[in-house]
Amino acid sequence: MRRIVFHQNGFGDLLVCFKALYAIKCLYPKDKLVLAQKGFSDENFLENIPFIDEIYTGDKNFENLKSDIFITNIRNSSFFKTLHKLKLGRIITQPHLLSLLYFDTPMPYKRAKLHMSEIALKLVRAIDKRHYDTNFSKINFKEVKNLLPSDDTLSEKFFKQNKQFSKIIALNIFGNQTENIGFNLLPKTWLDLSKNLSEKFPEILFILVNFTHNTLQFNIKEKENLKVFVNSDSIASLVAFCNRLDGLISVDTGIVHLCDILQIPSLIFIPKHTFYRFSGGSYGGKCEKFSLENGYQKNYAKIMQIFYKKANHFTTRIKNENSI
C-alpha cells in the first residue's frame, strides 16, 4: 500500500481540488490518500470525508508523512526549492522552471480556459497516464456531493421558523480573496439588489448569507421573503444549508466552489482573469458568470444596472424551473 499525499492550502482552493482527491481514491483504492493542507479551519469536516484517509495540517515536516508519492498544487519557486531538499518519494507538481528540473510534471501542458479542478486532475494523471486514461471515464464525480459531511442543526431551525416558498435563492456578498483585491460590489449595492429581488419575486425566499466570524454583520429590516442566515464555523452546517437552495448569487469565493460540488445553479460576480479558473459548473450544475476587468468601478452605476438585469434573468430562470 502506497501513501499518496496531495497538498493544497486554503478553503476555496482546496474545495476546487476535491475532484482530484476523489479521482485518486477511485483510481487507487488500495493506497492511502493523505491530504496535507493549511488554511481550511474546519478539520473535523475534512476528517469525515470518506475518500480522504488522513489529514495533515501545517506546512512543515512533510517528511514525517512518509509519502511514496507527493503531489502539490502549489506553484511557487521558493516552495519548490524547499521540496527539492526533502525526502518525499516521487514528487509531482505543476510545470515551472524549477519543477521541470527537479520533479515530475504533466506534459504536454495546456491549461488555457480550463477550470482549476481540471488543472488539478492533470497532476493525478501524471501518477500513471495509462491507468488514468483507461479508468477515468468510470469515475462519477456527481457522487462527491453525497459524500460531504452535513449537519442540518442550524438550517433546520432556520427554515422551520420561516414560511415555505416555491424556491430559495441565497446571496453571498462576502469573500476574503475578492475583498483583498478590491473586486466586489459595495455592500449597499448587494443589499439593494436583495431588496429589489424580494419585491419583484414575492414567491421566492431570498437569504443573505453571513458567518459568525465575520466582523461585518447585516443590519436590515427582514421581510417575509428576505431573511439573514448566519452560519457557524462548521462547513458541514454550510453544506446542509446549501443543499436547501435552488440558486446562489455570489461574489467569487469559497461558497461558490461548495455549491459547484452540490450542483446548485449559480450566478457569480467574478474577475475576468479568473473567469475560467474559479467559477461553478464543473460538476454539471448550471453557472452563469458576470465578469469584469479591474477598474470597472469607473463605470460603476452603468455596470450595476447590467448586473441587476442579469440577476433578474437568473432569478426568473430559477423561478420557472420545475426541478433543479
Language model: regions and residue ranges:
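Catalytic machinery of carbohydrate-active enzymes
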Residues: 1-324
